[in-house]
Amino acid sequence: MTDRRLLLVHAHPDDETIGSGATMAKYAAEGAHVTLVTCTLGEEGEVIPAELAHLAADRDDTLGEHRVGELAAACEALGVTDHRFLGGAGRWRDSGMMGVASNHRDNAFWQADLDEAAGELVKVIREVRPQVLVTYDQNGFYGHPDHIQAHRVSWRAFELAADPAFGEGEPWRIAKFYFTATARSTMHRTAEALREADVSFLTEDAIDDLPFGCADEDVTTEIDGRAHVGRKLDAMRAHATQISVEAPWFALSNNIGQEALAVEHFILRSGVPGPAGPGAPLEVGGLGEPYDREADLFAGIH
């Protein structure tokens, strides 16, 4: 199809690159209109480079401003030209990890009024009119309050945008709503590759205890972004306060090695599945036979 429009909603700067960077770069390179909405500036993030430690929330509290620049550079690396902050930059603040005091700030995204935040996203949806929306599952992928809230806001906006009685602008019904996902088999394959490369990672048992990762059979869609993983790695390097990169590996502030995945997985939450496409090879992160998964987020949309 022509005139493809993809909307992604992520919680903080860097989430877009880690979870869907290869997919974003692929569709941007193919000429699709890719819109990224980021819900906060990531003010509560930890800072990796020692020389930038003063930016942290418990010191100068200027990390959010710095990460605006990092995100702009990452979007440039991915080829994405349409980026917005939900409600404008700084409207809602990073809530921090679940259970910390920053969850309770009045302007924390975790405290945002659902319909108000969703209303801001509806404005974007009705302007851009995307056929596809990508965000997190109801657990926020790994339980971060801002990721959970991004899911809630996205789902509510998905409903409200199609309602002619809500707000201003022409209603728009998004055809397909996806969650980002990481298949368990991919996590175990990555762990083995990291051990062979003598890179610190988790034990097999610890992987199964992580709050993310899904059964392979739950994955509905597999996007092969191998041709664009270089752009994903460049975007990761742009998020220098949050990510250290030694291709093909990267690490967050916990210094646990992970692979920059070139094949990214998604779960179709709402919409009609399109026809299955060719799967990526197992050795590069594909899920293998049976090849009954979509290979295109826009599959089946006419």
Curated annotation (Swiss-Prot):
Function as written in the Swiss-Prot or TrEMBL entry: Catalyzes the deacetylation of 1D-myo-inositol 2-acetamido-2-deoxy-alpha-D-glucopyranoside (GlcNAc-Ins) in the mycothiol biosynthesis pathway.
InterPro entries to which the protein is assigned, alphabetical: GlcNAc_PI_deacetylase-related (IPR003737), LmbE-like_dom_sf (IPR024078), Mycothiol_biosynthesis_MshB (IPR017810)
Top class in the EC scheme: hydrolase
Record-annotated disulphide pairs: none
Cofactors required: Zn(2+)
GO biological process: mycothiol biosynthetic process
Family per similarity comment: Belongs to the MshB deacetylase family.
Swiss-Prot/TrEMBL keywords: Hydrolase, Metal-binding, Zinc
Enzyme Commission number, as recorded: 3.5.1.103
Pfam families, A to Z: PIG-L (PF02585)
Stretch forming the signal peptide: none
Name recorded for this polypeptide: 1D-myo-inositol 2-acetamido-2-deoxy-alpha-D-glucopyranoside deacetylase
Entries under Gene3D superfamilies matching the protein: LmbE-like
Native organism: Streptosporangium roseum (strain ATCC 12428 / DSM 43021 / JCM 3005 / KCTC 9067 / NCIMB 10171 / NRRL 2505 / NI 9100)
Residues binding Zn(2+): 12, 15, 147
Reactions the enzyme catalyzes: 1D-myo-inositol 2-acetamido-2-deoxy-alpha-D-glucopyranoside + H2O = 1D-myo-inositol 2-amino-2-deoxy-alpha-D-glucopyranoside + acetate
GO MF annotation, one: zinc ion binding
Record's cofactor remark: Binds 1 zinc ion per subunit.
